[in-house]
């Protein structure tokens, strides 16, 4: 795999998102508890974050825990919260001396979130807010519909009576991120699952059948090459192509 060639390709997306799906099913295949799948998924995410940075991609969003995931068994939710606590500690240890900004998307005011997770998340965002390089956007207690409603209500509270697309974009959790180019959802499921609904309006999607803990760097490269082979039209078509086809 020629990383430098890939990295220097002008078609490389600037902002990608990962729906890290299939941890539980991966564990079940091996006769293990679902929580073990989350542990392996968490370890894989750390490797993939570094690889994404090495590729020169500017922004990475990761769907870690949805607003609907509270409906899972309490033991699993508790385990995930402990993983997030560990994840935030790792980010502080590994990233504070690098040009990496952390922006966490999701409802941090939710009383169901453990106070230690909430406090560490807010502190990490504050400590890295001056960084101008790579942006890592973990989405925790996040829902796309909830984010849109929050943006609308924030606009109203500011006295806006005519809300534009730019107003909405400015009030999303992702306001300081680049436009979303590419979404990868592992496990083969083909659903948005309430993830970045506004941001992904014209994003490209890719659905590898691999469960997240088994998704490799080679899998990511394959996904990126697939993205770069596509023609992004954003609802339009070039005049010469229209003439050829009609």
Q: Language-model features: where?
A:
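Flexible, compositionally biased loop and terminal segments
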Residues: 1-246
């Amino acid at each position: 795999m020629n990383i430098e060639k890939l990295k220097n390709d002008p078609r490389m997306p600037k902002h990608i998102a990962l729906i890290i799906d299939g941890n539980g099913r991966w564990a079940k295949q091996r006769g293990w508890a679902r929580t073990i799948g989350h542990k392996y998924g968490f370890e894989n995410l750390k490797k993939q974050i570094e690889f994404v940075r090495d590729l020169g991609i500017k922004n990475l969003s990761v769907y870690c825990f949805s607003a609907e995931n509270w409906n899972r068994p309490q033991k699993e939710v508790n385990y995930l919260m402990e993983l997030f606590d560990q994840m935030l500690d790792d980010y502080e240890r590994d990233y504070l001396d690098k040009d990496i900004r952390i922006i966490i998307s999701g409802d941090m005011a939710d009383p169901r979130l453990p106070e230690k997770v909430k406090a560490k998340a807010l502190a990490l965002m504050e400590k890295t807010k001056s960084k101008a390089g790579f942006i890592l956007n973990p989405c925790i207690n996040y829902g796309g519909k909830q984010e849109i409603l929050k943006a609308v209500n924030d606009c109203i509270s500011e006295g806006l009576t005519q809300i534009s697309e730019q107003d909405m974009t400015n009030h999303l959790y992702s306001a300081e991120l680049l436009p979303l180019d590419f979404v990868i959802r592992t496990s083969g499921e083909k659903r948005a699952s309430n993830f970045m609904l506004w941001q992904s309006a014209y994003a490209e999607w890719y659905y590898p059948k691999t469960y997240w803990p088994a998704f490799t760097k080679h899998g990511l490269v394959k996904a990126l090459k697939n993205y770069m082979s596509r023609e992004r039209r954003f609802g339009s078509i070039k005049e010469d192509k229209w003439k050829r086809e009609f």
